[in-house]
Amino acid sequence: MKTLRNSTLLTSAISLLASINIAASETTIPVTAENFSHAETARNYRNWAAQGANKGFVIMPGLPPRGKAAATVQMNDDTLYGSAIVEAVDCKVTFSIPETDNYFAVQVVTERGHGQQYVVEDGAYNLPVESQYAFLIYRSGTENGIDAAKANLGKVDVTDFNFATSYQVQPYDYDEVEKWVKKYTQEVNSMDNFTYTFPRTSKDVTDLHQWNLENAAGWGGASPEAFVGNKYANSSKMKAGTCYTSTFNDPENKFFTSITAYDSDKYLMEDVRSINSHMWDKNSDGTVTVSFNCGENAKNNIDTQGNDFTFTSRHYGVNPTVINSAEDPIISAVKAQ
């Protein structure tokens, strides 16, 4: 992308889950704090393998499904997704980014949930990865429309991929994994301003509990590398019957900024739109006001359709000033009206 150098699929996929081989071990692996990131990643690999991502490049036909029909929590409403589960060769994975005129990124997620690599420039890549298998997340921006975003995903050279045809779903009790996810997500929802760190590798984890919270509430996010990677933060749970606003200075991230509402389980909600810097209306002084449930005439209003919610701020190609902020500038400015 030279200019950016500086629910149908899933429904049918669920029926395929039973046909996916469980890993050779006959013993179910108990979930612990120590292996939670692996278990939650295995759950996501399972969901995407059910759609065929270990055998082919899966392109979502439109914006993500709402609710738990989505394969992954906190999918965003600003990009379309393409995905593949691949196997490393000599501890490296190979892929490429075509030349496009929209935001286009690839993230390499290890079996421990780490986004070890995140690249945004077109070209061919052969990059190291710490696990045998890796999940490739392609994000194609919708700033030029959904059809254009989908067409650009169609330009991906799938012959680059060493598809993980031998991948076997790990033998966790996924109902138990879900219980851990719910417990951790409730903890995140109780915090006023939860910021993600997304360490790139296992050795970079300095706070296991923080890392588990990040995997439960926002699996698959990217590390906050200035002007390349992203930074994310979650609000606390907010009431549908209250009008909230946040007025803030434009973060001036390299690619774009977005604000997305989710239900208490961190899934997208029916008929609830997101707001991003490609579409928002600025105030006369250059600041930005985003509103929640304040009426159709409110500035940049997000109507959660009568549902309590949390919201996530995303900074794509994050500005160093946002990286260095003690709190997210959008969430910290929220006020009930």
Regions found by a protein language model. Give the residues of each.
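Bacterial N-terminal signal peptides that target proteins for export
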Residues: 1-10
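Bacterial N-terminal signal peptides
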Residues: 11-19
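Intrinsically disordered, low-complexity peptide-like regions
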Residues: 4, 19, 74-76
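A compositional/structural signature for long, glycine/proline-rich flexible linkers
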Residues: 24-337
